[in-house]
Amino acid sequence: MQKYLVNAYLDSYDTITIEMNKDFFAGQTKSFQLVKDDKLVELTIRDFQSLNDKDVYHLDLNVSIDFTSQYSIMTYNAYLTPLIYRFVVKTEQFQNQFYYQENDLGVVVKDGKTTFKLWAPTASNVWLVINDKMYKMNRGNKGVYSICFDIDLTNMSYNYLVNVNGMTNLTIDPYGKCQKPNSTASIVVDTSADNSSVREKKRDLIIYEVSVRDYSKESTFKAMKDGLDYLKNLGINVVQLLPVNDFAGVNDYFPKRYYNWGYTPVSYQSLKQSYNSKIDSYLAINQQFKDLVDEIHKNDMLITLDVVFNHHYNACDSCFEKIVPYYYFRFENGDYSVKGGCGAEFDTKLLMCRKYFIDTLVYFTKYFDIDGFRFDLMGFLDVETMNQIASTLKKIKPNILLYGEGWVMDSAEKEVKLANHDNRELMPDYAFFDDEFRDCFKGNTFDYANKGYLTGNYQLANWAEKFFSNDRHQYINFVQCHDNMTCFDKIQLSCPDESHQRHIARQKLLIAAVLFARGISFISAGQEFCISKGNRENCYNASDEINNLTNYDKSKYQQVIDYTTALIGIKKEIILNDNSVCKNYDGLLLIKNNNYELIFNPKEEKCKYSFHDEKRVIFDGNKKTDYLVNNHFEIDRLSFVILKEEK
């Protein structure tokens, strides 16, 4: 954002704010004029405030502003400064005047014609740039600029040149469905096809979180598609990919030089070109991703995408800010709100910001046949936006899977309710990651020494009961995700005096809890083979050496992989309901549900479980079994077993 000695901002339809540097004639003047071409209007000073580094004036504006024009403010010594359309863009009047309902923003290729449309209501001019040639676009209804060519321009690269607030900005298309490497230009793509299909609802969801980069040595969509057998054999039924839309932090031409998970979004409707196995064929990325999605579906799994709608990596240099400055992001004290520590917060309650993200999800759902979305730091997004997302996507896929991080965050947004745990009941179509579950069973994530119920603090058994006996369809059960240190690292830190084998046993117990607590099961890549990242708290940019799954010898922990696979298979076979009865017997948990008995023994000693009838052993603590026992069953230390009542 350009700063001048005198900065003039249109903050509402009747208010102009002047911020005058004290170096400009000591920061004080007695008159201001609104200038447009050869016309001048005297402005009245409403109030004045002197601050340490500047003087602030509020002026009354008694004339109508034409947003197709660029105005200036003139003051002492005939000094001219551009009138910046600032917080006027956040007013209800602006929303009503410029909200565009149609679904044709971006590029539409149809009947041999190519139409470009860009929403830029505060821009005085917009040009389309193709092959260094500039084509002036026409301003139409609701501030939408458009131009049409009687030719199919598929695979052509383009940019927009936007004249706004006295600046001329070269930018990519926020609705671009493909970008050149490193987001230097957008690519024309025909995305008119609706490839979505409705799939049968999974009875028990088991989500597996993984990064495309980490899954294979090649770190491409194609390599992941060719190596899906591992996930199929593991038995999970939902593949959740870490961000695949275009992001910063990785050079697409030299992808192995720097590492990044992708929570640094740049372009939301296009895919990250570093995952393209044919980097010089830009559109190949879309087909390769479609092939991956199709292969996941062929293997009877669903696919969900991790989307980062809460913040932008570099707001001031984003296409959003270059096209409609001040509109898309939240501001606090005149600057971007960055309360999450990741980047500027999106102002999702604004109609065109909300529409953008809904349009983005509709595109991925229809064109790529995506089955659901995980919302990063969902607590920064507003409830109304999330509910509109749900209602829109359910019309396409009634069983769409929607979930996210509902942490209660400090945000600049104070006017509307935010999509956090406290407002869960207002969002019935969403599931929330349950940090209470995580901390109960594993121990407090942020206190390395803290023990959970399954890592040595048996007194937490009463707390643990609730996770097996309540309706928890809105909860995601997890003990490890991409954030924070791995579960196995946490176990080793919180149980430093135990043997390696004991650590493995506790890892197994935690996997069992994730799979059989009521709610949605969530496993993070590597959890099933005790992945350790050297106690690193956050590996988002660590290296391929640390993060890539192929660097780990899975055979060392084959017993844990087999254990996980067996339990997933059992979870799919047996029918459990929400009417569990869970009891704590001196630190042991006994869960009774629909003729099944699930028992957790997190203690260091064996336990004899006595009963008066005959029971079938479904899982003996290590593997799937099928044999009968009478009167009693010995439960090994640090183990989980499943029995079935015989009638």
Q: Language-model segments: what does each one mean?
A:
Residues 211-222, 226-368, 378-381, 386-397:
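Substrate-binding/active-site clefts of carbohydrate-active enzymes
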Residues 118, 210, 241, 296, ...:
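Conserved, mostly hydrophobic/aromatic
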Residues 519-537, 542-596, 603:
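Glycan-recognition and catalytic regions of carbohydrate-active enzymes
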Residues 176-182, 390-538, 575, 584-585, ...:
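Conserved alpha/beta catalytic core and glycan-binding cleft of carbohydrate-active enzymes
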Residues 23-43, 124-132:
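Short, surface-exposed alpha-helix to beta-strand junction/turn motifs within ectodomains of secreted
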